[in-house]
Curated annotation (Swiss-Prot):
Pathway: Porphyrin-containing compound metabolism; protoheme biosynthesis; protoheme from protoporphyrin-IX: step 1/1. Fe cation binds at H194, E275. Its main location: cytoplasm. It comes from Xylella fastidiosa (strain 9a5c). Pfam families: Ferrochelatase. One of its GO terms (biological process) is heme biosynthetic process. It is found in: Cytoplasm. Belongs to the ferrochelatase family. GO terms for molecular function: ferrochelatase activity; metal ion binding. This is Ferrochelatase. Its EC number is 4.98.1.1. The keyword Lyase applies.
Amino acid sequence: MNHTSDTALLIVNLGTPEAPTAAAVRRYLGEFLSDRRVVSIPPLFWKPLLHMVILPIRGPRSASKYAKVWLQEGSPLSVYTRRIAEGLTQHLPDWRVAWAMRYGAPALTKALDALQAQQVRRIVILPLYPQYSTTTTASVQDVVEAWCKRTPQVQVECIQDYAEDSAWVAAVAASIRRHWQAHGRSEKLMFSFHGLPQRVANNGDPYPQRCQVSASLIAAALDLNESEWVLGYQSRFGAERWLQPYAEPTLWALAESGIRRFDLVCPGFSVDCLETLEEVALGFSETLAARGATMRYIPCLNDDPAHVQALAGLAQRALL
């Protein structure tokens, strides 16, 4: 059946500032941190704190970090997400393929409107978050559900997650093997995932379990025993307790125990971005070097052909 005119895949990533400037970062963070899925503090208290304290401080500070990793084509997250969409058109020639961001541009609602204007009747939404969380995937679903209420004639399927999808697991494992073949193997492999307030997990968010499943499956695909890998959580924000173990202090403790060479991969990130390139590849490496250890960062899958093929398979199965 030819789906050219009526079926589409819309991949959705988190979002990014449009430029590595304080003003652009403030706009982006203002939208991101105003999502009640991300920050659940009552708006009456949160909005003044956000706009009067947090954004004026974090805007310039984060802009300088973005500048370190910005590509000639733009933000790494945006560049790689677009390339994935372009690659998907090769695997899904009878589909329309589009991409959007939950925060910033291209806006999710505008992308949905554009597909409807092209007479699309079925849309598969694929949030590029391998592990489901109420703070990420559910936020995308909120926007999609609101859009569907005013556009009931379009059939929409939203993929929940792909934490244990065999093709995705194989793609991550293959990328690690290629790294080892090119650079040799270190003493310990860390799987570092974006953190989450412990409070959110206590309220039933399955994210930590999904991360554990992904890490265990990738480790099994690499024939690693439990002593050869470790899981950690990064990117903590604020003062409250987040999921543990925290990635960077865990690396420090392992270095102090005598381990000197680490490899680190971030399977919770579909593409490289500020958190992987600046926080991990640059930041973690620097603090470990100060402790006499080395860390090599293994890039995200980005537009790796095996990654693109795995995502295409997810989209096709969503309509079965």
